[in-house]
A protein has these predicted regions:
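Hydrophobic anchor residue at the start of the ABC signature
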Residues: 10, 77
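Short helical segment in ABC ATPase nucleotide-binding domains corresponding to the A-loop/adjacent helical element
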Residues: 11, 23-31, 44, 48, ...
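Signature (C-motif/LSGGQ) region and adjacent switch/coupling loops
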Residues: 3, 23, 52, 60-63
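Catalytic "switch" loops of ABC-type ATPases
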Residues: 12-17, 126
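Conserved signature/switch motifs of ABC ATPase nucleotide-binding domains
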Residues: 62-65, 83
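Conserved ABC ATPase "signature" region
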Residues: 31-34, 38-59, 111
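Catalytic Walker B motif of ABC-type/P-loop ATPase nucleotide-binding domains
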Residues: 88-91
Length: 173
């Protein structure tokens, strides 16, 4: 399924439109989803809030070529989260981010899922990230003909917090 009002996608590569500003890249998605039910001012507020959430409010008017790769990824994440989709598909969304931003956005994602009831399907390569964010982990075999290797249920209580997870005796590093 392609991106749409009920499906947000965060690609491994940011996939921003190069001729639009950071604000306009996010606003395009917000307008598509909420344009029929919200005023222009509400749409702008929602867009600005999404960019603020990912720490990009300082770059609203910059175009993708004017910001770093990690910043581009944050704008892509803001675009998907601003849509409040029922299903959020994420392909290594935090891989290009610095550790502090990654941790903050992981925590924000946990909160957004609780608030919106969204389902997240994510492809991470970081085991700790998978355990923190997931209820079930589907492990794949290696190679071009990859298949499902094992499905693991994460037995840790929700809500999950990073610090509490590290101290939980059932969590083995």
């Amino acid at each position: 399924a392609a991106p749409g009002p009920e499906r947000g996608v965060v690609f491994q590569n940011h996939s921003l439109l190069p001729w639009l500003s950071c604000f306009d890249n996010v606003h395009l998605a917000v307008e598509r989803v909420f344009g029929a039910t919200e005023t222009g001012a509400q749409l702008k507020t929602r867009t600005a809030a999404a960019l603020d959430l990912v720490g990009m409010s300082h770059a609203l008017h910059k175009r993708p070529h004017e910001i770093s790769g990690g910043m581009k990824q944050r704008v892509g994440i803001a675009r998907a989260l601003a849509m409040e989709p029922k299903v959020l598909l994420m392909d290594e969304p935090f891989g290009a981010l610095d550790a502090l931003t990654r941790a903050r956005l992981q925590d924000e994602l946990l909160g957004i899922v609780v608030r919106t009831g969204s389902t997240v399907v994510m492809v991470p390569h970081d085991v700790d990230e998978a355990v923190l964010l997931s209820d079930r982990i589907v492990m794949m075999t290696n190679g071009p003909a990859a298949t499902i290797g094992e499905i693991v249920t994460v037995p840790l209580q929700r809500p999950r917090e990073r610090v509490a997870l590290a101290e939980d005796p059932t969590y083995v590093h």
